[in-house]
Amino acid sequence: KRLNKVLTYINNTDKLVDVGCDHGYLAIEAINKGVKLVQLVDNKTMPLDCAKHNLEKLNRLQDVEVIFTLASGLTKIDDRINVATICGMGGDLIAQIIEESFVKAKALDSLILQANTKVEHLRLYLINKGFTIIDESFIKDKNKYYPIIVAKYSGAVSKLTSTQIKYGPIILIKKEDDFIDYLNDRLVHLNNILYHT
């Protein structure tokens, strides 16, 4: 479900880099969607080898350019790349990846980010560094909740309230079902604390 949601933010004309490529599943689905240039980046050889193995099974590779890169974050991305996905990491690590390659990050058309932890830290970093949050989603996947942030550099420092930083300015507007479920779960949890302590 998370993967499918991330894919909705990728167009078939995009040139994609997937940072922290895991098994290459996102790249495979992006290629199936029509993306013609995919770069998979990881700082460990095992995930890259696993991704290579999985991508070799694809029939459509003859008209697709796939680049495998052993590197940290966005440091060695191809100059043609216009969209980056950085998913399944802590928000502090995602912020660090962007900071380490700030010039490259701000030149991209969009950063599609999915942090497992420290999402508030990531939002604060983005807005303080001149990135605008252009879209967000909130997904429940295998009984865990995940916000997805789409950001683009604008140079403008956005002003967000503490509630917007905590939950996401666009997530609060969209009020998706999974977000409502999350708030209800939190309410039950907080009530349990209140009445059992």
Task: For the regions a language model picked out, list residue spans one by one.
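Conserved class I S-adenosyl-L-methionine
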Residues: 13-22
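S-adenosyl-L-methionine
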Residues: 49-78
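Short SAM/SAH-binding signature in class I
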Residues: 81-88
